[in-house]
């Protein structure tokens, strides 16, 4: 209501226009970020295409104090989320419910989004490294694996932990 959508250029048309305006002879791209069909279309633009994945990786590997602080904060928030979740796990809860707790505390903690789909498995299912949560109800004394991560301040975390309700058998 009260707005109008205006599509001026496609992504590749905008790239082509910019290359011409700036009289560019080279275009640097990250292979991991460009679809094959986009790459094939870029080859038709009449410029040399340089793959910059390694160069960008080398630049990103060096962290300044602000980046290190942001990473530490993201990990601290992740630790706090896990601590809150395990305080609420009870015998009879489903893996789905535990996964929902992870999502809830992540959102409540200010996470921009989850880094990946949360994995919760229990009992013999903990042997499945990428098992998705199910309606299986957790039992006392059995392992519960929780694998999750958040995106906070544009930094990702990834935590995998195994816990028990009571002492392991």
Placement of each model-derived feature along the sequence:
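Basic, ligand-binding patches in group-transfer machinery
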Residues: 120
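Short, compositionally biased
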Residues: 157-169
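Short, small-residue-biased leader/transition segments that mark boundaries at the very start
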Residues: 2-7
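Conserved protein kinase catalytic core
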Residues: 36, 153, 164
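Acidic/histidine-enriched ion/cofactor-binding microenvironments in catalytic or ligand-binding pockets
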Residues: 20-23, 114, 126-155
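Flexible, acidic/His-enriched mid-domain "rim/lid" segments that flank
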Residues: 10-114, 168
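Short acidic loop-to-helix transition motifs that present clustered carboxylates
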Residues: 11, 124-127
